[in-house]
């Protein structure tokens, strides 16, 4: 009897510790009375609805303020979101006991993270940084030199992290350390792949960032509302609370919203003008034919039922319909993927930083899928395939030194002079 008591005694605290760590376990809905119930049957749904609505209100308000401040502030917001996402994902597979035996090992994860950040943003923003500092000769020389050796600098930082990792390998900890190494690199791919497209969209014109992001928010809100009030038919086993009613209702609302929002956003130069540098001043530009109104006569069978015979729309609204269809039909699969991932690790949410929503990563699953599509769609079907003077100048400023640019100018002048004389 004493042996049994002595043998069982240590198991009590272990059970309590595991319970605290897994208090959000949703593997099969155990411990959660509404784990696999539809929202329409959830007795606590109104409390959950109010908490979620309150958080959504503040997030939309803060987002609107940052959009008003401009491209650079939106990029800073994306960076902050990346850091929080990486933190949540790093913590997912960490084990406190192992980390205590590996002092400084967590710091290595962040070393790789900020090295990847330097590489990605250096590639995306290099030309705009050059455009910003061009008037200052000293800064211009410094920046162009850094850009020239940017890849070598990033590679050196990565190799230093790689050597650091090898030197920290510890007996009986190899498996944990290599799993963390692989997990870190997977996080970097997930986080920085989508963010690079997101930032590229921002500087192509806030419109191409704001509209796709807004459509995901609208789709998420109306999927929740339609499922909340009308949901009866489960949609997918990975997300038991998702319903066909919510999915269809959100899809219709998202497509309609895409068409209408494109018309509203397309009227503001602040949203449609691309930003060629890293300044924060007001923008004035010719937004191009996509954002100029066109008048279309309505077919007779439609105009008979309406008080007007023609409508004025922006050509970009047709592109917005494609974005709306993707946001409502394909992008939600990013959320389903995240749901399956969380079930694999037996967690409810990636974090708890947003009341009623979970963590930052829980809000970004569909946004990541949408940002990549928006960029690819914009480059493939919206941007004209022409070699413009601006693009040539960008390549000259970035790739050539000041002396080479002067030599090019002299050579170009001679060629033009010969053409004029020859004609």
Swiss-Prot record:
GO terms for biological process: CDP-diacylglycerol biosynthetic process. Its cofactor is Mg(2+). Keywords: Acetylation, Lipid biosynthesis, Lipid metabolism, Magnesium, Membrane, Nucleotidyltransferase, Phospholipid biosynthesis, Phospholipid metabolism, Transferase, Transmembrane, Transmembrane helix. It comes from the Eukaryota. The keyword Magnesium applies. It is a multi-pass membrane protein. This is Phosphatidate cytidylyltransferase 2. It comes from Arabidopsis thaliana.
């Amino acid at each position: 009897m004493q042996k049994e008591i002595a043998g069982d005694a240590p198991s009590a605290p272990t059970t309590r510790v595991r319970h605290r760590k897994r208090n959000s376990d949703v593997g099969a809905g155990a411990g959660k009375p509404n784990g696999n119930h539809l929202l329409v049957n959830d007795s606590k749904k109104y409390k959950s609805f109010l908490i979620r609505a309150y958080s959504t209100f503040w997030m939309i308000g803060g987002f609107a303020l940052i959009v008003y401040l401009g491209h650079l502030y939106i990029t800073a917001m994306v960076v902050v979101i990346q850091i929080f996402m990486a933190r949540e994902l790093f913590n997912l597979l960490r084990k406190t006991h192992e980390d205590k035996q590996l002092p400084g090992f967590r710091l290595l994860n962040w070393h790789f993270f900020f090295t990847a950040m330097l590489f990605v943003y250096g590639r995306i923003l290099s030309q705009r940084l050059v455009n910003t500092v061009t008037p200052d000769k000293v800064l211009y020389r410094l920046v162009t030199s850094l850009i020239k050796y940017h890849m070598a600098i990033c590679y050196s930082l990565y190799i230093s992290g790689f050597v650091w990792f090898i030197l920290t390998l510890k007996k009986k900890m190899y498996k944990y350390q290599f799993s963390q190494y692989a997990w870190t690199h997977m996080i970097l791919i997930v986080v920085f792949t989508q963010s690079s497209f997101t930032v590229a969209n921002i500087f192509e014109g806030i419109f191409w960032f704001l509209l796709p992001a807004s459509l995901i928010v609208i789709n998420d809100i109306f999927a929740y509302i339609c499922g909340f009030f009308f949901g009866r038919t489960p949609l997918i086993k990975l997300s038991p609370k998702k319903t066909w009613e919510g999915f269809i209702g959100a899809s219709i609302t998202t497509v309609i919203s895409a068409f209408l929002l494109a018309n509203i956003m397309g009227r503001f130069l602040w949203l449609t003008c691309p930003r060629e540098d890293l300044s924060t001043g007001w923008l004035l530009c010719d937004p191009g034919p996509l954002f100029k109104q066109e008048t279309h006569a309505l077919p007779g069978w439609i105009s008979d039922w309406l008080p007007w015979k023609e409508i004025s729309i922006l050509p970009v609204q047709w592109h917005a319909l494609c974005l709306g269809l993707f946001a409502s039909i394909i992008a939600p699969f990013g959320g389903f993927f995240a749901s399956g991932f969380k079930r694999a690790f037996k967690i409810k949410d990636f974090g708890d930083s947003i009341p009623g929503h979970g963590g930052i990563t829980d809000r970004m699953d569909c946004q990541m899928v949408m940002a990549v599509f928006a960029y690819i769609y914009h480059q493939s079907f919206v941007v004209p395939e022409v070699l413009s003077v601006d693009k040539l100048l960008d390549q000259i400023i970035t790739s050539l030194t000041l002396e080479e640019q002067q030599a090019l100018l002299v050579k170009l002048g001679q060629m033009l002079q010969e053409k004029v004389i020859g004609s």
